[in-house]
C-alpha cells in the first residue's frame, strides 16, 4: 500500500516517531494509526488479510483510538468498492464508486481542490475554508449516512465526498 514513504516523511517533518506495524502487537507503542494507500482495493484487502491485521485494525478503530485512512486507506473502511469483488472492512456503511464521467473532466481526477469542511471535527474547524489539497483519484466514497461526511470537494458541478 504505496504512499508509506510520503506519509513517513511528512510525519518525520512534524517530529513524530514512526512505527511501521507488521504485527499488531507493535500497535501497543502507537498513539495513532495511519492506514495509507495507493493501489487497488482487492489486493490491499488481501494484504491486510494475509498479514492477519483485519480484526485488530477493526478493534483499534471501534475502540475510538486515533485513526486516519488516506486515499485507499479510507476506501478500505467501507463495505465494498466498484473496483473489486472483495469485501471491505465494513467499519463505515456504504461503498466506494468510480467517479462518474463528466464532459470535459478527466478521470482520474488530478489536481488541487479546495477541501470544504461540512462540520467541525478533530482535523480542522468549520471556519478553515481555505484548505487546498492535491488529489489523484478515480473513486469516491458514498456513505449510507451522509452525516459522517467531514469534508467534500466540488468536482465540476457535483460534490464529491
Feature names for model-found ranges:
Residues 24-27, 62, 95-161:
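Amide-donor transfer/coupling interface in amidating biosynthetic enzymes
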Amino acid at each position: 500500500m504505496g504512499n508509506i514513504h510520503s506519509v513517513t516523511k511528512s510525519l518525520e517533518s512534524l517530529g513524530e516517531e514512526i512505527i511501521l506495524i507488521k504485527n499488531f502487537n507493535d500497535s501497543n507503542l502507537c498513539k495513532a494509526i495511519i492506514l495509507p494507500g495507493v493501489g487497488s482495493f482487492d489486493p490491499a484487502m488481501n494484504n491486510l488479510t494475509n498479514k492477519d491485521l483485519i480484526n485488530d485494525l477493526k478493534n483499534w478503530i471501534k475502540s475510538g483510538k486515533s485513526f486516519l485512512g488516506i486515499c485507499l486507506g479510507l476506501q478500505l473502511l467501507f463495505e465494498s468498492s466498484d473496483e473489486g469483488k472483495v469485501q471491505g472492512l465494513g467499519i463505515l456503511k456504504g461503498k466506494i464508486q468510480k467517479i462518474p464521467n463528466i464532459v470535459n473532466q478527466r478521470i482520474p481526477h488530478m489536481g488541487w481542490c479546495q477541501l470544504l469542511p461540512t462540520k467541525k471535527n478533530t482535523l480542522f474547524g468549520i471556519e478553515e475554508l481555505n484548505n487546498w489539497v492535491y488529489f489523484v483519484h478515480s473513486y469516491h466514497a458514498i456513505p449510507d449516512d451522509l452525516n459522517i461526511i467531514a469534508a467534500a470537494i466540488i468536482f465540476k458541478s457535483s460534490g464529491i465526498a
